[in-house]
Amino acid sequence: MHSQFDVRVNLTRFEKSVCKYEEAEIREGQILFWGSSLFTRWSREYDNTPLEEMIRGKDGSQVAVNHGIGGATAEELLFYYPRMVQPWKPRALVIYAFPNDAAAGYSPFEVMALKAKLLDHARVHMPGIRFYLLGVNLRTKYLDEGSLWNTTENRMLQHNELLEDYCRRHGDCTYLPVHQSPLFYATPEDAGHYEKVRRDIFVEDGIHFNQEGYDLFAQFIRESLDDIL
């Protein structure tokens, strides 16, 4: 499944990861998390409590499936949709991608268009499915690098605006603005300002959450998905 844009990544580079997920038992009707390393690292492999254990139904039942592929772009989320999403027939889809796309040369608009195409396919195959589109996640990398940070932040904010606008126009979509949640800041007044995020909730690379970061992120997700848990 391809987009209308020039493909800027090797679409088969994550074949091993995809095959590994395909070996697992298919559980239909779950909330499927489909995205890049924000989800991949939410696992014991990275010394974090797994997503499936932290996002549970209100009755304690298992409701989530984690299909994170570290390094993936929206182009690859679309390409692998027939294998990684469609067979599971999820009742809800939580989607995250952007940083890797920007690094590969995709514009905020192109990333939004790729996500929209993925959602269009899901609507056809799974009528009534709900979508949750995560805004660009917080980070501390580049914060102290002046113009590089300004360029990075502008792209993130532009993509967030596109996500918010798309969700406003589609009743089956909910926009989840991570950067606006006070959970990730020292004071509520700092919420919404990427540059004021707490630095102690990330691992050394300044991009990925540590366990405390994932504890907060899990709370954010549970609150955001409360009506379907």
Q: What is the meaning of each model-derived region?
A:
Residues P108-L118, M156:
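Charged helix-capping and loop-helix junction motifs
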Residues K141-Q180, E212:
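Substrate-gating cap/lid alpha-helix
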Residues G68-G70, V94-S107, V136, Q180-S181:
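Cell-envelope and extracellular/periplasmic
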Residues M1-G70, E75-E76, Y80-K89:
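Serine-esterase "nucleophile elbow" of acetyl-processing enzymes
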Residues Y46-E52, Y185-R199:
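Short, flexible, mixed-charge acidic loops at enzyme active sites
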Residues M126-R130:
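A short helix->loop->beta-strand "cap" motif at the edges of active sites that frequently abuts
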Residues Y81, K115-D120, N160-E164:
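Generic structural signal for well-ordered alpha-helices
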Residues L77, R198-L229:
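Histidine-centered active-site loop/cap adjacent to the catalytic His
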